[in-house]
């Protein structure tokens, strides 16, 4: 099973300018290498059969004939292979010369795509030799003894995907041919290029491809010539780049003196989901009305067992590397701006937050502090309420008080023990029975206290629940589930930890920083069950519902990508192979789907709160799901996993 992945390659072969036999042999070698690695489609650079830098030699009949002989050699010697190859070469026909891409498979030429936009400025002189596709009316060409379709509107259909082709400068045009190809169904776009180097040009190139890939919601394979091309005036670095929907997933080593084959997998299943979700894509297809494409069928590619080369981030919600600081600041600013608008609009006099000494309430408090500072309001109008109960430990209690005091907010302490004891008497519940009644009564008592204090102080209760908890329904209905504005509702648990740590290290004095770092290291717990005999947390959330890093991984690929359970399991096993065994992953995947469906009723009445990332489960925004939807199909697929 390939799970919707199509294995593609960008090849940068060694080249000798105007030596077609040598170039054909190098191309053959890389096709054979790619076939052995399960590649389904491989692209080569622009004019790779002759070399791009032949100059006025393109006017020589010998070069053109040898180029076709080189193509015949490649076609013949790869006729037993399943792989589809896209080669660049000059093609002479009816008194003109075309800079073209030729698609071959199993001993046949499938089609020819000529270049549309010929650069004729600065170091480029292509119009000196070549004719643009727009000036050619023919729709077929004789090549290698075959008459094959020709045009810029060819779409090549395989059993797994549809792809289209453009050549180098085509991408730089205001409306590239690939835009039309994508609107007509191309899911993967190939660009055969001869892109020379210049200071800063590579970053611009990556930005350009990223934008086109994202705009077309497509895979984009860019392949440019490298070592061996003439360096009379310019240098070619051998750029092989593979993008998917705006993200770079594979790249070549620039300035290599050897041939390279860069391989990765395009997730066409995900691209199809994105195109369905982003309705402007189909709307553009209707409004722009591109002409009807010519569809070319390919032979069935023998699907080998998928050997996925792509790596997947175990923490897809968490920014990495140089992006970390910028993204954390951006996320924090979204939360702050959302809360500020709500406070100003309601003319609230205070913000009331329940502080447990855990991660979520800590982040909510930090958002409140930053919001009040930015509005120029006194921190004393932030009322932090610690409400110790039967399961509160010294560690979390101390951290809650230390944090509130170091931040200079108003601190209130209201124990819930006596109120809960009385409540248990009122409803005739045995206090020694630590069941759901015992736990939820405490959560609802805390919410009642916060709501009443907010009424006392003309304030708003700020919700602390995060995206991961809400996805799993790990919240007491009308308890911690409820607030007047929830700032964390779109922030997953794995990201909460990074945000708190980021604030600690970038925006806090030493006392606050040390407290925050200890909170980050504290086991996640609702602390509704009494501590153990040593005073340590007994009720650890991740022992009960599973590791949050797994659930956040499941959540991302379920909601963001629309993947089915078997595909999520496949990716999770690969990604966490050194952390969890398959049975553990399957167990928690089953828990995830069971709880996600069963707990939708809590998400159907969530308080308002700002969307932060690409995923939100607000019933008014991103996620509108009936509370009584059946989970049977999803759970059945999980159960069937080997």
Each language-model region and where it sits:
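ATP/NTP-dependent adenylation/nucleotidyl-transfer catalytic domains that generate, transfer
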Residues: 7, 18, 159, 216-218, ...
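Enzyme catalytic cores with a strong preference for nitrogen-chemistry domains
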Residues: 1-352, 370-379, 411
């Amino acid at each position: 099973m390939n799970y919707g992945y199509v294995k593609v390659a960008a090849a940068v072969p060694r080249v000798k300018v105007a030596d077609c036999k040598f170039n054909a042999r190098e191309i053959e070698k890389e096709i054979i290498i790619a076939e052995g690695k399960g590649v389904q489609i491989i692209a080569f650079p622009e004019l790779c059969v002759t070399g791009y830098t032949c100059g006025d030699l393109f006017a020589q009949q010998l070069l053109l004939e040898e180029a076709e002989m080189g193509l015949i050699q490649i076609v013949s010697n790869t006729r037993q292979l399943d792989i589809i190859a896209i080669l660049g070469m000059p093609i002479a026909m009816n008194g003109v010369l075309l800079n073209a891409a030729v698609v071959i498979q199993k001993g046949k030429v499938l089609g020819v795509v000529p270049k549309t936009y010929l650069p004729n400025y600065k170091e480029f002189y292509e119009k000196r030799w070549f004719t643009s596709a727009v000036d050619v009316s023919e729709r077929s060409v004789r090549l290698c003894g075959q008459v094959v379709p020709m045009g810029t509107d060819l779409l090549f259909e395989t059993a797994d995907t549809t792809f289209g082709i453009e050549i180098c400068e085509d991408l730089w045009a205001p409306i590239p041919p690939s835009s039309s190809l994508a609107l007509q169904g191309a899911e993967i776009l190939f660009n055969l290029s001869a892109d020379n180097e210049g200071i800063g040009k590579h970053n611009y190139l990556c930005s350009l491809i990223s934008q086109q890939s994202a705009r077309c919601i497509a895979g984009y394979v860019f392949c440019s010539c490298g070592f061996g091309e003439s360096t009379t005036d310019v240098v070619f670095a051998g750029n092989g780049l593979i993008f998917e929907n705006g993200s770079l997933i594979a790249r070549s080593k620039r300035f290599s003196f050897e041939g390279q084959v860069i391989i990765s997998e395009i997730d066409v299943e995900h691209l199809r989901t994105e195109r369905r979700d982003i309705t402007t894509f189909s709307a553009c297809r209707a409004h722009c009305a591109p002409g009807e494409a010519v569809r070319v069928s390919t032979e069935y590619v023998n699907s080998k067992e998928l050997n996925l080369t792509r790596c997947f981030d175990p923490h897809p919600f968490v920014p990495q590397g140089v992006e970390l600081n910028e993204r954390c600041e951006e996320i924090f600013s979204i939360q702050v701006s959302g809360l500020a608008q709500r406070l100003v609009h309601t003319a609230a006099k205070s913000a009331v937050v329940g502080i447990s000494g855990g991660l979520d309430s800590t982040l909510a408090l930090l958002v409140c502090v930053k919001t009040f500072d930015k509005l120029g309001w006194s921190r004393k109008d932030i009322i932090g309420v610690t409400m110790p109960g039967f399961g509160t430990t010294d560690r979390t209690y101390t951290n809650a008080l230390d944090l509130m005091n170091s931040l200079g907010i108003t601190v209130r302490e209201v124990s819930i023990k006596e109120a809960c004891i009385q409540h248990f008497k009122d409803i005739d519940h045995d206090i020694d029975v630590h069941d759901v009644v015992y736990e939820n009564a405490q959560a609802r008592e805390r919410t009642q206290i916060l709501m009443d204090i907010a009424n006392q102080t003309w304030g708003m209760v700020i919700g602390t629940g995060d995206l991961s908890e809400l996805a799993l329904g790990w919240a007491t209905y009308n308890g911690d589930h409820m607030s007047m504005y929830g700032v964390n509702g779109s922030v997953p648990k794995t990201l909460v930890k990074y945000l708190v740590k980021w604030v600690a290290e970038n925006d806090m004095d030493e006392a606050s920083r040390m407290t925050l770092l200890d909170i980050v290291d504290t086991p996640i717990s609702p602390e509704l069950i009494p501590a153990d005999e040593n005073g340590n947390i007994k009720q650890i959330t991740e022992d009960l519902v599973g590791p949050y890093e797994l659930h956040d991984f499941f959540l991302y690929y379920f909601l963001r990508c629309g993947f089915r359970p078997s595909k999520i399991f496949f990716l999770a096993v690969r990604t966490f192979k050194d952390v969890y065994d398959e049975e553990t992953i399957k167990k928690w995947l089953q828990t995830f789907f069971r709880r996600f469906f069963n707990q939708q009723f809590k998400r159907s009445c969530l308080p308002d709160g700002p969307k932060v990332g690409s995923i939100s489960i607000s019933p008014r925004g991103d996620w509108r799901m009936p509370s009584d939807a059946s989970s049977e199909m999803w759970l059945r697929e999980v159960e069937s996993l080997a």
